[in-house]
Amino acid sequence: MVHFTPEDKTNITSVWTKVDVEDVGGESLARLLVVYPWTQRFFDSFGNLSSASAVMGNPKVKAHGKKVLTSFGEGVKNMDNLKGTFAKLSELHCDKLHVDPENFRLLGNVLIIVLASRFGKEFTPEVQASWQKLVSGVSSALGHKYH
């Protein structure tokens, strides 16, 4: 379990309140699919993913990215109970979708890069460290049901 200090919680929520979930979620998922193309196999129904520009402009990628980041927001609200917050999603991704849990870590790292690019100097090393704790905790919670 990840322990969040009061400073961590402030660092995370101060950024989260300014995040455009649709925009950042869409970009984060799209970047994941471009940089780690093997992750595309989970998104066969999304249509054209044949090039970086196709992925970045794909409306289904953007919509699912929003859905993913909206769910991530539940983790922001429930930092002290990440395992419980993501229990059902962990089960879904493990038992039905068979997603490699390493992909959760990769997406978390991409999210941090997108946030850093959006927030610039406001995304200080301390803020980044707090966000690393959060994405690590969320990744661990999502991977919890795996055997």
UniProtKB/Swiss-Prot annotation:
Keyword Nucleotidyltransferase tagged: no
GO cellular component, one term: blood microparticle
GO biological process, any: hydrogen peroxide catabolic process
Expression sites (tissue/organ): Red blood cells.
Keywords, alphabetical: Heme, Iron, Metal-binding, Oxygen transport, Phosphoprotein, Transport
Residues recorded as bearing Phosphoserine in the entry: S14, S51
Residues binding heme b, per UniProt: H64, H93
Keyword Transmembrane applies: no
Domain spans labelled Globin: 3-147
Molecular-function GO terms, alphabetical: haptoglobin binding; heme binding; metal ion binding; organic acid binding; oxygen binding; oxygen carrier activity; peroxidase activity
Recorded superkingdom: Eukaryota
Main function: Hemoglobin epsilon chain is a beta-type chain found in early embryos.
Family classification: Belongs to the globin family.
Name by which UniProt lists this protein: Hemoglobin subunit epsilon-M
Species name: Didelphis virginiana (North American opossum)
